[in-house]
């Protein structure tokens, strides 16, 4: 199935559309780097587009635009469709968490008169990639009186940045040079340099005390308050065009905020009432298995679908309607996939691997080895998606996650499929996935938006 590079056949007007769409995305991905930040952004934009908190609605009719917020870290947007909801919905589910470092509950320490922030890495990172790179600290802290304090340090013009200092090559021979990549630094040593000025004190750890004093002066945060916090450490810096032609985007967190952005824009841009109820669901915790009360395994999906159906059916509501609505639904697990990286092309089956700039990849299954932990979309659903994309002249390509037994991974697809929802993975291809600088194609981003919008309209 050889295809010509789609860029070649594009008009200048089409190229301008793609580049203009990407500029808005770059601003988004540069500013909103955590799941809380993306949720807040999405809610603000949705309200401007006419979406209303579902808690304020007692009845729902076709055309109503509503949202459900799950503890400020997951959010679902829905447009009630013309058809009976028990006949099925069209869902697109992406995740807004990305691999990162999280501060420990008691994080601040001092070693050799330098103050550090102790961390626990979150998700599948290559630990060595986080050494000697500028870092930003973001999150929330709840003070002892319950007051919520938000932190965002490292990306504003006059902000300091933070760093995990690496060992110099002159002294790394025994401690690092001959180790495997995942042993170059131990997880326990992913400690972030946050201060060096001591204060006058009779106590030890004068630099730590000085750092804590500065934090208290600016944020009212005391050392014990970190126990009730969610502090995330992410790469500092903004999204950049990659290459002389500027056709690629380099940024942190594109897994999976590129899909979150495309699916949000798609549902916001729906001009007519869809036939089926359209749902855009942004979830948390995918990178660690979709666990926790804000992950897809929490059954929040079932909760808000039940609430929608109750507000549609009222006295005629019953649980069977919920089960039918889920069973008859189709969903896109909107998550990125691994593009061929020519430097490491031996891990891919080139005939079944996506390329940057060839359109949105269709991934029938993920998992590892013998399709273990995969949902494996049925041929009927793949046929439906293929026809949908072709009918709307949307560029697409096939994708698998590397050669058989080379490795593997998973998405939220299996959790959606557990409800009986027919599910397929479909999201842009990425080079350097899970790194501080992931690379995507502007063409693929735009075609993801077109694909998601076409799916909602069906």
Swiss-Prot record:
Residues where Zn(2+) binds: 95, 170, 434
MF terms in GO: aminopeptidase activity; metallopeptidase activity; zinc ion binding
Matches recorded under Gene3D superfamilies: Aminopeptidase i, Domain 2, Zn peptidases
Keyword ATP-binding assigned: no
Enzyme's top EC category: hydrolase
UniProt superkingdom: Bacteria
Cofactor(s) the record lists: Zn(2+)
Keyword terms of this UniProt record: Aminopeptidase, Hydrolase, Metal-binding, Metalloprotease, Protease, Zinc
Residue ranges of coiled coil: none
One Pfam family this sequence matches: Peptidase_M18
Entry keyword annotation includes Protease: yes
InterPro entries linked: M18_aminopeptidase_1 (IPR022983), Peptidase_M18 (IPR001948), Peptidase_M18_dom2 (IPR023358)
GO BP annotations listed: proteolysis
The enzyme's E.C. designation: 3.4.11.-
One term under GO cellular component: cytoplasm
Family: Belongs to the peptidase M18 family.
Cited PANTHER family: ASPARTYL AMINOPEPTIDASE, M18 FAMILY AMINOPEPTIDASE 1-RELATED
Protein name: Probable M18 family aminopeptidase 1
